[in-house]
Structure formats: C-alpha cells, structure tokens
Design a protein with these regions (language model features):
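Short helix-loop-beta junction
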Residues: 43-51, 137-141, 217-235
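Glycine-/acidic-rich phosphate or pyrophosphate-binding loops and their flanking alpha/beta elements
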Residues: 10-17, 157-168, 177-228
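Short, conserved beta-strand edge motifs with alternating hydrophobic and charged residues
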Residues: 172, 209-210, 233-236
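Thiamine diphosphate
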Residues: 1-172, 176-177
Length: 236
C-alpha cells in the first residue's frame, strides 16, 4: 500500500478485511456510522456490508454486549463497539462474569470469542465520566485479553488478530491517536497469543514502558531527555 493511513483509517481497513473474509462476522453497538462517536473508523461499513451485519442499536450497553457474547458461544464472530468505554461498565456482567469465565468453567471446550471495542473518547466537550482509560482494571480479569495499539499498523493488525482469537478480547483505541499517520503493508495475520511487547527505541540510561497514547507522549519526552544527554529505551 503506497499511501499513508490515519490511525482511524487503519481500523477501518481492519474492519473491511474482516467483513470481506469472514461472512459470519457482525458488528453491533451505538453510533456505528457517526463521526462524532467513532471518527472515520467505521465510515460506510453499513453501505458496503449491509445493516444486517453493521447493527446500530439504541443505548443499552448490557443488551448489545450480552448479545455479542452469546453469539460467540454458538460459533459466530462478533464485535461490540462501546464509543465511550466509561459506559461499558453497564456491561460488566456479560464481559467479566460470562465471556471471561466460560472457557475456564468448561475445560476449554467452548469460549466466547467476542471482541469488545472500547474507545477512549476524552477531550473537547467530554466530562470526567467520558474520559477514562480503564485498561488496567480489565487486565486483571483472568480469561480476558486486553489490546491497546499505539501505532497505525497495530491498530489494523491487532484488530484482526483480536477477532480471529479464540479468546474474548478487549480492544482499546484512543481517539487522540486518530491523527497519527503511517504506511500500511499488506495484511499479515498475527496470532494474538504470540504477540510480545515491541522495543521501539534502544537506550542505555533509563527504560520507559508505555502503551497506547502514552507511547506517543513517551517519544516526545525522550526527545527532550536526549537533548539533556539521557539515553532512553522505549518499550511499547
């Protein structure tokens, strides 16, 4: 691919790849074609793939999440979108008590391979109840994988890997990253369970460990420290 993509456009490319190649996949949630909710990350998906597969719902986080979790238990692939992860707390039961537990309760014979997209939607007119990043909470839940891509490439490729994983996955994207741009190679299918932290920069004085938007902030901090003669290692 010989053009640059924005972070949100890379997510859109991931959705297009998945919906084109996996006919049993559907997406459900609120504001799925509203730029105010999801930027350009889902632009025209309803026109390309139909509203039977791109299902925009009334406001009921528990209902649409429970539906997606249940569909995963009967072999379907589903993505449920929460435009503000703060309100995903209304869906704690299907995520934490059902999706995350199912494989362990039944000896690994069945699992809800639902992907839960949670958007960090802070800034602008957003209040404190709209601006949280709750990734560390969910990272403590056994059976639930948590993904927070910081790069354009990872935004696409880790979305695809999340949906193709056998486990329930919480995929978190930060809207403050949407303006980042980079080139995309052809899709390479990754196995989510094999992904490791990325060494972004080598350094000899201090190590900085970051994820998502904090990786971008860390790069800026490293440039300042570099001018002071401090060499930093950055792990994403």
């Amino acid at each position: 691919m010989n053009k640059k993509y924005r972070y949100d456009e890379a997510i859109l490319e991931g959705f297009k790849f998945l919906l084109s190649n996996y006919s049993d996949l559907f997406i459900i949630g609120q504001g799925l074609w509203s730029p105010w909710y999801v930027g350009n990350s889902m632009k025209d998906l309803d026109k390309l793939f139909g509203k039977e597969r791109i299902i925009d719902t009334p406001v009921s986080e528990a209902a649409c999440t429970g539906l997606a979790v249940g569909s995963g238990l009967v072999g379907m692939k589903s993505i449920v979108v929460h435009p503000r992860m703060d309100f995903m707390l209304y869906a704690i039961d299907p995520i934490v008590n059902q999706a995350a537990k199912w494989s362990h309760m039944f000896g690994g014979k069945n699992s809800s391979n639902v992907t839960i997209r949670a958007i960090i939607n802070r800034g602008g007119e957003q209040g404190a109840q709209h601006s949280q990043s709750l990734h560390s909470w969910f990272a403590h839940i056994p059976g639930l994988r948590v993904v927070m891509p910081s790069s354009v490439k990872d935004a696409r490729d880790l979305l695809i890997a999340s949906v193709l994983s056998d486990d329930p996955v919480l995929y978190i994207d930060d809207r403050w990253l949407y303006s980042q741009e980079d080139y995309l190679n052809e899709v390479e299918i990754l196995k989510l369970s094999e992904q490791k932290p990325n060494l972004i920069m080598k350094g000899s004085d201090i190590t900085i460990v970051a994820n998502s938007y904090s990786t971008l902030l860390s790069k800026k901090a490293i440039e300042i420290l570099k001018r002071k003669g401090i060499s930093c290692e950055l792990i994403d």
